[in-house]
Amino acid sequence: GDTPEPGSDTVRALAHALNYPTEFFYLSDSEALGTEAVSFRSLSSLTARQRDAALAAGDLAFELHGWVAERFELPAAQLLDLRDEDPIAAAEALRSHWGMGAKPIEHMIKLLESKGVRVFSLAEQHKHVDAFSCWRGNTPYIFLNTFKSAERSRFDAAHELAHLVLHIHGMTNGGRDIEREADMFASAFLINRGDLIGHLGRVNSLARLVSAKKRWGVSVS
């Protein structure tokens, strides 16, 4: 038979324990997120249970976003459709569109959120998932594994941004060419080519290499 609805006392207890508003638990269910719409980089290595759990986390994020969006004015998506662009040219085009110039990105997550990307952190039970992204209507989402170094998380965010602009609504879940394109985009987006060339001549020691790493927020390797 049908699953019984939890009582009001149970809902209030859940809301208190999870620090969610009580009304959130009375939202109607939205359409479930399917694997075909998601940029699962490590899909082939995930078990069905791990994949379904990550998708369920995405569904929960959609519900939460819907509740927040009804009550607060959130930035509209300011992404470009760059499906026909070379990954490096696409990264430069998006930096230009966002008026970023050549300067390093101080805070990747804040940048994405200011441009209308909804960014969510995956809970510890999903740490086997690198990261994933998808479009929900006209709203782009990125889900990050935050149990990594700050540099790795920045790169993951830029990699998923690549999927959102290069592979819009056409995710192929881990194809090598798709992932290589996303990596190329991420590298070019995080480190502007002109800024890199301007600093390469000064990076002639390990100390300067570490300084360059701090400048761009990327791994030395």
Q: What is each stretch, according to the model?
A:
Residues 1-221:
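Short juxta-domain linker segments that transition from a proline/glycine-rich
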